[in-house]
């Protein structure tokens, strides 16, 4: 809708996921003369605008979090519903993966991100369960992580409507992709 309504304006789309950019390019093809898509993190907005020779913008719209297509691709490791390697990177060129977060970050840091980024009330128990499991062998897949999370939760929590791993997966994904840091950086520039 935005691209269709621009008359003299230009829409700059920034995404760190190359597949999302390809999909956006197809979707926005009718307005290609008004749209520029850039493979970057939106936290690099100032650099992107400098490279395009743009000195200011009239508005900014941030589409945060994970998309349905990313969840649908099990091999990306975002979903707690399908078995896949622990990845969760929005941009596969980034180095930090969910595997590294889950298997190498200190227990207290895991507890912190589970609580702060996922609002997980069982964060201490889940972090402790992860710490115990990875002491035996690394947690390598999404469903292995789901099993560890389930093992740390009381039976009543497992009966709740929401999937028991939802908040933890959200927290780990946010940490892997530095999503809150990216928002903070783009707001500083905006």
Indicate where each model-derived feature is located.
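S-adenosyl-L-methionine-dependent methyltransferase catalytic core, i.e., the SAM/SAH-binding region
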Residues: 1-190
């Amino acid at each position: 809708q935005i691209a269709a309504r621009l008359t003299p304006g230009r829409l700059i789309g920034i995404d760190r996921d190359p597949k999302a950019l390809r999909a956006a390019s197809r979707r926005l093809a009718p307005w290609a003369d008004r749209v520029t898509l850039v493979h970057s993190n939106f936290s690099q907005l100032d650099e992107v605008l400098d490279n395009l020779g743009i000195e200011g913008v009239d508005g900014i719209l941030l589409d945060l979090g994970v998309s349905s297509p990313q969840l649908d691709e099990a091999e990306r490791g975002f979903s707690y519903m399908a078995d896949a390697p622990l990845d969760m990177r929005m941009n596969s060129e980034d180095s930090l993966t969910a595997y590294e977060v889950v298997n190498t970050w200190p227990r207290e840091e895991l507890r912190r991100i589970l609580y702060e980024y996922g609002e997980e009330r069982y964060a201490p128990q889940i972090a402790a369960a992860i710490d115990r499991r990875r002491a035996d062998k690394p947690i390598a897949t999404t469903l292995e992580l789901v099993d560890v999370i389930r093992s740390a939760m009381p039976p009543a929590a497992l009966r709740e409507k929401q999937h028991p791993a939802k908040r933890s997966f959200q927290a780990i994904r946010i940490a892997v992709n530095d999503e809150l840091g990216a928002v903070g950086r783009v707001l500083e520039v905006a």
